[in-house]
């Protein structure tokens, strides 16, 4: 991925903030209240997604039809939804940006849906390692024995993780 370069930013209107919040609510339910704020800004960057600053911190990211917390958002305001737990052997691969492989997955939330974002956490400390896009629904992933189950789009140590605004 090319370096993440912030281009410009501006504060969202209340109607836009409400729309972003409702999209976040579709993804993580009632936990979206953790990310409610009077001041939400959007940052234009070189990334293929939008970055939203909540209280001047890059806590949300958005694709074409979804809004989901960044890793920094998950660390600062943890929530239980959309969680894929990987064993400790997968951690070193995840922090380098690898996709999630089924043999390393030990626990799968029931609310994981295909082409929707999810959080990847380690099994021992439950610390977030990555944000990914599910390649299948939760029941299908449970039945799988091999192969990829999520594509990583943001991981610890990448440009978005290190972004300072």
Where are these regions (language model features)?
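Beta-strand/loop-dominated core regions that host nucleotide or nucleotide-derived cofactor-binding catalytic loops
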Residues: 2-49, 53-58, 62-106, 111-114, ...
